[in-house]
Structures are given as structure tokens and as C-alpha cells.
């Protein structure tokens, strides 16, 4: 149900007339996901959850009050990047703690989160004017990105064949995903973000 709320909500965000209902549906989807998680029967540290909600709420209000509407794209880029970083940190914590979770799933979460983090911060830098807003392209750029992505796939295959230590694979994926996030974002001009 929450996934449907997210998907329909995101779809409705694509048009100004339906954006409000899209935002509501996506928020409702998130609420359902949170309630489902908290009522799943798992043992949670409610103090930490309350602390996280409290800190997040305070920071959210402070940011919302200070950010002007013209700075909204930059704020979205930062929040997107922080969401990616959170995903990468959760995957890293699961890996370091020796979680029973699938190693491949942890690596994929790390890959997506790290790629999102680096790409979003390049987008923020372009939108904010910290780096050139022009598209940065060079010969062989797409081949380089394909090689990096292929290397990540090869590392996951190497894990399945027990060819490399898990630590080597995990940390190499982190570096490659950071590079790929940058490589995929720099050719996009600031006006197109």
C-alpha cells in the first residue's frame, strides 16, 4: 500500500494541478510504511526513535523557515543526498555489525545510497553556484561510466564466486559508486537540474 502511495504520489507531482494531491499521497505512503515498520513486532529503542524524530523535526522547521522558494531545488538536492547517505550508512552499519541481511542487498543499498549522495551534492553545487553550472563533458565519459558500473557488477559476481574478501568488495563499491554519481551528474547543466 505504501509503495502504491509513493508511486502514484510521485506521478502526480509531475503536474502543477495534481502536485498537492501527489504530495499528500506520497506522505500518506510514508506514514503507512512507518506505522507498518513500528508495529511489525521488532524490538525498537523508542528513545532513539523519539530523539531522531525530535532532532529531524527541529532541523526541518529551521530549514523550512529560512529557505526561500527560489532555493527549493538546492534544498531538494541536499535532502536527496542526505537520504542517499542515510541508505549508505544503514548498509554500512549492517555490514560492520555482521547482520544476517543478504550481502548483495547491503552492497546494492550502499551502491544506490552512495551514488545518490555524490550525484545530489554535485547537483546542489551546480544549482548553488559553488561549481560551474555548465555541462562538463569529455571524450570517453560514457565509456568511463559504463566501465565503473561494469566493475561494480564484476565485484558482486566476484563475491558470489568467493574471489575477493568481502571487505575489499564493500569498500571498493563505495569508492566506485561515489565516482559514478559524480560521473553521471557532471554532464548535466545546472539549468537542466
Segments predicted by a language model, with ranges:
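Structural signature of hydrophobic alpha-helical transmembrane segments
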Residues: 1-3, 23, 40-58, 102-117, ...
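N-terminal, positively charged regions that mediate nucleic acid binding
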Residues: 1-34, 40
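C-terminal ends of transmembrane helices
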Residues: 5-18, 57-76, 120-135, 180-190
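Cytoplasmic-side transmembrane-helix entry/capping segments in multi-pass membrane proteins
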Residues: 18-29, 49-52, 71-83, 135-145, ...
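Core segments of transmembrane alpha-helices
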Residues: 30-31, 145-153
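Alpha-helical transmembrane segments of multipass membrane proteins
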Residues: 34-38, 61-62, 153-157, 181-185
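Transmembrane alpha-helix boundary signature
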Residues: 37-50, 62-73, 88-101, 126, ...
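Mid-bilayer segments of alpha-helical transmembrane spans in multi-pass integral membrane proteins
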Residues: 57-62, 81-96, 106-122
